[in-house]
């Protein structure tokens, strides 16, 4: 049975996407070789993925401790008060980084289903700065939020799907 062209395109896109997620710095020639496609086909697929916002961007994964930053995870529960439209826009469209400019760099924000309603991961210099960021968040939108849990990351085993290249030296901490 012949598959439709849409099914084939989706399968080809997923192959290219998987290669980009392994290492987005690879050349189009290398990606094409790994996928078994022509260079032009890979270029067209990547362009299509970018145009349709399936690929949001490309990032470099760095050891932020080298820059004097520590990684924190903030788990937040909502309370029963409904969000105002302006607060929704502030949380989704604006940057939480602006709450403490030059102090905090927000990595990820997820709205979740489960014990907590949101997860915010960020980098700051120390626990005091992390607590200041939490205080600033609660100062601005605290009436909509319940309890929170602040966690400091000791070290990443994997980051963005890639294994930490220094993991062998960190095994003793497990």
Q: Where are the predicted features?
A:
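A compositional/biophysical signature of low hydrophobicity enriched in polar/charged and small residues
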Residues: 1-174
């Amino acid at each position: 049975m012949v598959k439709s062209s849409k099914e084939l395109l989706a399968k080809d896109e997923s192959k290219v996407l998987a290669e980009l997620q392994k290492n987005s710095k690879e050349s189009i020639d290398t990606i094409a070789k790994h996928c078994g496609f022509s260079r032009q086909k890979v270029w067209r697929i990547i362009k299509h993925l970018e145009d349709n916002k399936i690929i949001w961007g490309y990032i470099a994964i760095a050891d932020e401790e080298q820059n004097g930053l520590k990684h924190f995870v903030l788990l937040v529960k909502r309370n029963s008060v409904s969000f105002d439209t302006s607060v929704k826009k502030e949380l989704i469209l604006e940057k939480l980084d602006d709450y403490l400019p030059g102090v905090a760099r927000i990595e990820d924000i997820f709205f979740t289903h489960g014990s907590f309603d949101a997860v915010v991961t960020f980098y700051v210099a120390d626990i005091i700065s992390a607590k200041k960021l939490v205080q600033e968040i609660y100062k601005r939108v605290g009436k909509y939020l319940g309890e929170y849990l602040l966690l400091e990351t000791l070290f990443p085993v994997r980051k963005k799907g890639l294994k930490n290249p220094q993991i062998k030296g960190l095994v003793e901490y497990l």
